[in-house]
Swiss-Prot record:
Domain of life: Bacteria
HAMAP family: Ribosomal_uS2_B
Biased composition (Acidic residues): 236-255
Region of interest (Disordered), ranges: 231-255
Protein's organism: Geobacter sp. (strain M21)
Lineage, highest ranks first: Bacteria, Pseudomonadati, Thermodesulfobacteriota, Desulfuromonadia, Geobacterales
UniProt GO MF annotations: structural constituent of ribosome
Pfam families, sorted: Ribosomal_S2
A Gene Ontology term for the protein's cellular component: cytosolic small ribosomal subunit
Family: Belongs to the universal ribosomal protein uS2 family.
GO BP terms in the entry: translation
Full protein name: Small ribosomal subunit protein uS2
Keywords: Ribonucleoprotein, Ribosomal protein
Amino acid sequence: MSNITMKELLEAGVHFGHQTKRWNPKMKPYIFGARNGIYIIDLQKTVRLFKNAYSFVTDAAQAGETVLFVGTKKQAQDSVAEEAQRCGQFYVNDRWLGGMLTNFSTVKQSIDRLKRLDAMIADGTIEAYTKKEQLKLAKEREKLEKTLGGIKGMGKVPGVLFVVDPKNEEIAVSEAKKLGIPVVAIVDTNCDPDDINYVIPGNDDAIRAIRLLTSKMADAVLEGGQARNARLQTGAEEEFSTEGEEVVEETPAEA
């Protein structure tokens, strides 16, 4: 299991919350105090709750669940895309389309359209169109790629949502709640933690803080995936071994 240390959290600035005038009282249990008008997050609680979230994500990945990384604010976009790709999962880092989860069948039609446009470019069939039509199709593809590129390979709604800043991603959190999809989130002092299944109290504005926590969640996915692959491999080997055994018929000894 990947550990997170107090030193790592401090160096990344995970303990810095929002200004005291911009806070959600529901975050009080996770706040250590205030300094120069800024709330300081209790990192001992962050460490404990992070471990809970890490274990949950590891178990989910081991069970074969997919994880959707969500972070559309500028500070989160790169980390969310890079870490989701590193662990072979999906992401939304540009704009959350309403109904992305609750109306996934319609969203999937747009994903299929994006795949068709990709195929047309790859196999050269787009060359059959006029230059003007090609330009129009290219712009359509670019727009779809920007919004849906991170979920292009997602065939169904995910098993888990990992969210950077649930206040900013309230529509995504709301849709997940409606569908009963567990939400793991980096929750700052201005957020409402009530709809989050696994709260990780922390700074959701600093790039280093976001990168640290997001990369650790990607590690959890990788760890769970490795355990799943090892289990499946062992099962396959045992099955092969059983199938390969010769059945030797016993013959009675001659008197």
